[in-house]
Structure formats: structure tokens, C-alpha cells
Amino acid sequence: MIEPLLCGIVLGLIPITLAGLFMAAYLQYRRGNQLGA
């Protein structure tokens, strides 16, 4: 049995984590692009 609270926390953290990773990769890509140009 998984507690609804725990399930809600996990479901809430997953999109935030994915968004954070995507933002970090995007910023790093932009920074590398500017340095290359």
C-alpha cells in the first residue's frame, strides 16, 4: 500500500526534476553555443 501523500509527492517531483534537467541542459547548450561562436 502506497500512501496517497507519498504518491502525490512523487508525482509532483517528477515533472519538476525533468524540467530542471531540461533547463540545465538548455542553458549549458546555449553557453557552449555562445563560446563556440
From Swiss-Prot:
<keyword id="KW-0249">Electron transport</keyword>
<dbReference type="GO" id="GO:0009512">
    <property type="term" value="C:cytochrome b6f complex"/>
</dbReference>
<keyword id="KW-0813">Transport</keyword>
<dbReference type="InterPro" id="IPR036099">
    <property type="entry name" value="Cyt_6/f_cplx_su5_sf"/>
</dbReference>
<keyword id="KW-1133">Transmembrane helix</keyword>
<keyword id="KW-0793">Thylakoid</keyword>
<feature type="transmembrane region" description="Helical">
    <location>
        <begin position="5"/>
        <end position="25"/>
    </location>
</feature>
<dbReference type="GO" id="GO:0015979">
    <property type="term" value="P:photosynthesis"/>
</dbReference>
<protein>
    <recommendedName>
        <fullName>Cytochrome b6-f complex subunit 5</fullName>
    </recommendedName>
</protein>
<keyword id="KW-0812">Transmembrane</keyword>
<comment type="function">
    <text>Component of the cytochrome b6-f complex, which mediates electron transfer between photosystem II (PSII) and photosystem I (PSI), cyclic electron flow around PSI, and state transitions. PetG is required for either the stability or assembly of the cytochrome b6-f complex.</text>
</comment>
<dbReference type="GO" id="GO:0017004">
    <property type="term" value="P:cytochrome complex assembly"/>
</dbReference>
<comment type="subunit">
    <text>The 4 large subunits of the cytochrome b6-f complex are cytochrome b6, subunit IV (17 kDa polypeptide, PetD), cytochrome f and the Rieske protein, while the 4 small subunits are PetG, PetL, PetM and PetN. The complex functions as a dimer.</text>
</comment>
<dbReference type="InterPro" id="IPR003683">
    <property type="entry name" value="Cyt_6/f_cplx_su5"/>
</dbReference>
<keyword id="KW-0472">Membrane</keyword>
<dbReference type="Pfam" id="PF02529">
    <property type="entry name" value="PetG"/>
</dbReference>
<dbReference type="GO" id="GO:0031676">
    <property type="term" value="C:plasma membrane-derived thylakoid membrane"/>
</dbReference>
<keyword id="KW-0602">Photosynthesis</keyword>
<comment type="similarity">
    <text>Belongs to the PetG family.</text>
</comment>
<dbReference type="GO" id="GO:0045158">
    <property type="term" value="F:electron transporter, transferring electrons within cytochrome b6/f complex of photosystem II activity"/>
</dbReference>
